[in-house]
């Protein structure tokens, strides 16, 4: 017999009461919070794909390209130092060649140290500072090719500046070339040599206080303001370099400047616009916001900088090949074997020490930014090489910059001050 509670009851037996117990649920599994922690667990799991930039393939490929570029450029620098016959030119040529080792090795180290801590900021600061050094060195090399400021003024003084939107001279309509024009070209490149190290120092300080994040264009982040100042400064320097080439391209033609100019501009411009493109891709979400590298979280800006460094490692091999053709050492080795070499030979260590010394840059900056600039200009003069000495031909005959007594005497490098007429100021 069944009672209301659902229990059976037999005759003569006491009623046993009980409550209905539902079946017990299975033991609960430990919960994992969703969000960044879950992302980190997933990314750190064995089945997750490895980030390409930290893979052995990326590091191996970039290393092969970097060390090949270092060997090629190192041999070229050594060849110039072995034939250091024209110091006033080769000093700047070697400085230009050093862009490959500095760019390539800095980028490779940044790639190897890619992780939670943005070590690349420190390496990129060194690389970017040398970029300013390269722009100045190339402009000064062109000045040396042509014999100095006064020799250049003897050729272009008073000529009207052709207005052209393509060459960026449309705003100079009605103006003529003067010493003020040359001074602007020098000042515009020198200001980048000053601004870039200052901005690099500011970047390191902001990074230490967690106020600088690559690719973060927030108004409260230092990246926005550093980028604006840097872009304005490098654009002005490259514009001045282009203006000078536009004004003197006929004079520079014997020195085959096109390949030199395009190679230097390509190295600087390519890395500049490449970085800007990666920053835009990061802002558009193409580069993921967060990735896990060796268990640490890496922002999208750091990843964009990592891709930039990887591409620079690859590109520097092609840059080293282009520089071998743009700045060959054979023209100087021929002078070394001539009966009357243009200058006494120096040891390799002395030539290298002269090349890396920034003393001439400091002196040039003081000279070009000095209020007394309008009273004089600096000109590098040398005796013209005698017959059979080889070397670059002179673009024209000047009364002042080139003089000498023939090939029997050794050429001398003379630094002097030359007065400029007041009507040229």
UniProtKB/Swiss-Prot annotation:
Its main location: membrane. One of its GO terms (biological process) is regulation of secretion. Residues 392-402 have a biased composition (Low complexity). It is a multi-pass membrane protein. GO terms for molecular function: heparin binding; transmembrane transporter activity. Pfam families: Solute_trans_a (PF03619). The keyword Protein biosynthesis does not apply. GO terms for cellular component: cytoplasmic vesicle membrane; early endosome membrane; endosome; perinuclear region of cytoplasm; plasma membrane; secretory granule membrane; transport vesicle membrane. The chain crosses the membrane at residues 51-71, 96-116, 133-153, 189-209, 226-246, 261-281, 303-323. The keyword Transmembrane applies. Belongs to the TMEM184 family. Acts as a heparin receptor in vascular cells. May be involved in vesicle transport in exocrine cells and Sertoli cells. This is Transmembrane protein 184A. It comes from Rattus norvegicus. The gene is Tmem184a.
């Amino acid at each position: 017999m069944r009672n209301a509670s659902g229990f059976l009851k037999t005759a003569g037996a006491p009623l046993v009461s009980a409550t209905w117990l539902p079946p017990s649920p299975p033991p609960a599994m430990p919960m994992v919070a969703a969000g960044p922690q879950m992302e980190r667990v997933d990314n750190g799991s064995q089945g997750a794909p490895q980030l390409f930039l930290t893979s052995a393939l990326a590091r191996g490929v970039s290393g092969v390209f970097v060390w090949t570029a270092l060997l090629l450029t190192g041999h070229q620098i050594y060849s110039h130092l072995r034939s250091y016959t024209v110091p006033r030119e080769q000093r700047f040529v070697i400085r230009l060649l050093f862009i490959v080792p500095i760019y390539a090795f800095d980028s490779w180290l940044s790639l190897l140290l890619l992780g939670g801590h943005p070590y690349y900021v420190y390496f990129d600061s060194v690389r970017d500072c040398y970029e300013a050094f390269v722009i100045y060195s190339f402009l000064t090399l062109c000045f040396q090719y042509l014999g100095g400021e006064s020799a250049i003024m003897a050729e272009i003084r008073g000529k009207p500046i052709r207005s052209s939107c393509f060459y960026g001279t449309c705003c100079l309509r009605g103006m003529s070339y003067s010493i003020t024009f040359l001074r602007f070209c020098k000042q515009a490149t020198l200001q980048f040599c000053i601004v870039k190290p200052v901005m690099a120092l500011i970047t390191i300080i902001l990074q230490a206080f967690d106020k600088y994040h690559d690719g973060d264009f927030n108004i409260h982040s230092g990246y926005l303001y550093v980028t604006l100042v840097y872009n304005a400064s490098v654009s002005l320097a490259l514009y001045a370099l282009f203006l000078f080439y536009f004004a003197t391209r006929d004079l520079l033609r014997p020195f085959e400047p096109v390949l030199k100019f395009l190679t230097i501009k390509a190295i600087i411009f390519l890395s500049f616009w490449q970085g800007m493109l990666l920053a835009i891709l990061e802002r558009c979400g193409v580069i993921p916001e967060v990735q896990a590298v060796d268990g640490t979280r890496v922002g999208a800006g750091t990843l964009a900088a990592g891709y930039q460094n990887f591409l620079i490692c690859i590109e520097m091999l092609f840059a080293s090949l282009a520089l071998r053709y743009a700045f060959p050492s054979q023209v100087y080795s021929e002078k070394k074997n001539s009966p009357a070499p243009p200058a006494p030979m120096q040891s390799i260590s002395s030539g290298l020490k002269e090349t890396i010394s920034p003393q001439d840059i400091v002196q040039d900056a003081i000279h070009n930014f000095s209020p007394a600039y309008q009273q004089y200009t600096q000109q590098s003069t040398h005796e013209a090489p005698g017959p059979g000495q080889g070397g670059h031909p002179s673009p024209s005959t000047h009364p002042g910059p080139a003089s000498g007594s023939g090939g029997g005497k050794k050429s001398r490098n003379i630094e002097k001050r030359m007065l400029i007429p007041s009507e040229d100021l």
